[in-house]
């Protein structure tokens, strides 16, 4: 049995941002795909194209933004095997698990809230269980986006694999903008600053207009072989 490291690391420069989700258009707007949504917005904002990389079992891109090299990954393994793709990138580039930021949905938070942490358990999220198992560590930062609990008699699986309702879209848009800003804050000012700034905020109300600051067009580097 793999021993899992649980001690929060000293803050390490982020090298890879991973969004968890399921591939395919049928899952594109589901609650379980919040991580994919954030990585897609980062890729567009930074000018980093994503393309399927078989060696990584995922959609991957790299380039320069915010003064440094940035790597983005969306595992194409389906949620429960996400860790295979993350491990493949870490092994290829010889990255420390503590340099990975994983973005994913969380039913324990209501829609409109997000939560940054430097380490922690999977909290019942199967994608994170896979990442922790393959990295052999819980000691890596993560950004959780709230999707709330099922309503009425709906089960958990049906809830996370269900699409956001039209009435939820405005809140989701604000949360995604805030998540992009939180990732950029992590990169520029560090995880602790980002936690203090974003964890207390509630984006469920109409007065929340937080969004990332304007960014100069990113310079994209050619892919490494």
UniProtKB/Swiss-Prot annotation:
Q: How does it assemble?
A: Monomer.
Q: What is its EC number?
A: 3.1.1.29
Which keywords does this Swiss-Prot/TrEMBL entry list?
Answer: Cytoplasm, Hydrolase, RNA-binding, tRNA-binding
Location comes to: Cytoplasm
Might you name a Gene Ontology BP term for this protein? Answer: protein quality control for misfolded or incompletely synthesized proteins
Q: Which cysteines are joined by disulfide bonds?
A: none
Q: Where is the active site?
A: 32 (proton acceptor)
Summarize where tRNA binds, as residue positions: 27, 78, 80, 126
> PROSITE patterns given for it?
PEPT_TRNA_HYDROL_1, PEPT_TRNA_HYDROL_2
Q: Which residues carry the site feature described as Stabilizes the basic form of H active site to accept a proton? A: 105
Q: What class of enzyme is it?
A: hydrolase
Q: Which Pfam families match?
A: Pept_tRNA_hydro
Q: What does this protein do?
A: Hydrolyzes ribosome-free peptidyl-tRNAs (with 1 or more amino acids incorporated), which drop off the ribosome during protein synthesis, or as a result of ribosome stalling.
Instruction: Please give the start and end residues of each transmembrane region.
Output: none
| Reactions catalysed | an N-acyl-L-alpha-aminoacyl-tRNA + H2O = an N-acyl-L-amino acid + a tRNA + H(+)
Keyword NAD belongs to the record: no
Q: From the UniProt record, list the coiled-coil ranges.
A: none
GO MF? peptidyl-tRNA hydrolase activity; tRNA binding
Where does the protein principally reside?
A: cytoplasm
Q: What does the similarity note say?
A: Belongs to the PTH family.
Checking NCBIfam families in the record gives: pth
Q: What is the lineage of its organism?
A: Bacteria, Bacillati, Cyanobacteriota, Cyanophyceae, Synechococcales
**What is the recorded name of this protein?**
Peptidyl-tRNA hydrolase
Disordered: where is this region?
Answer: 198-225
Site note Discriminates between blocked and unblocked aminoacyl-tRNA applies to 22
**Entry keyword annotation includes Zinc:** no
Q: Which GO terms describe its cellular component?
A: cytoplasm
């Amino acid at each position: 049995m793999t021993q899992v490291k649980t001690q929060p690391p000293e803050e390490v420069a982020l090298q890879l941002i991973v969004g968890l989700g399921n591939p395919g258009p049928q899952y594109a707007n589901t609650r379980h795909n919040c991580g994919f949504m954030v990585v897609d917005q980062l890729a567009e904002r930074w000018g980093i194209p994503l393309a399927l990389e078989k060696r990584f079992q995922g959609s991957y891109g790299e380039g320069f933004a915010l003064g440094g090299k940035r790597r983005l990954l969306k595992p194409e393994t389906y949620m429960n095997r996400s860790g295979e793709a993350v491990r493949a990138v870490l092994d290829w580039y010889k990255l420390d698990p503590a340099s990975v930021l994983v973005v994913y949905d969380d039913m324990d938070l209501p829609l409109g809230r997000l939560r940054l942490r430097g380490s922690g358990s999977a909290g019942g999220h199967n994608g994170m269980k896979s990442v922790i198992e393959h990295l052999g560590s819980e000691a890596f930062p993560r950004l959780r986006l709230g999707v709330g609990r099922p309503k009425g008699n709906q089960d958990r699986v049906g809830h996370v694999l269900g699409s956001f309702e039209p009435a939820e879209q405005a809140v989701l848009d604000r949360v995604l903008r805030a998540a992009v800003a939180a990732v950029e804050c992590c990169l520029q000012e560090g995880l602790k600053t980002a936690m203090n700034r974003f964890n207390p905020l509630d984006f469920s109300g109409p007065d929340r207009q937080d969004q990332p600051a304007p960014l100069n067009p990113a310079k994209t580097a050619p892919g490494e072989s």
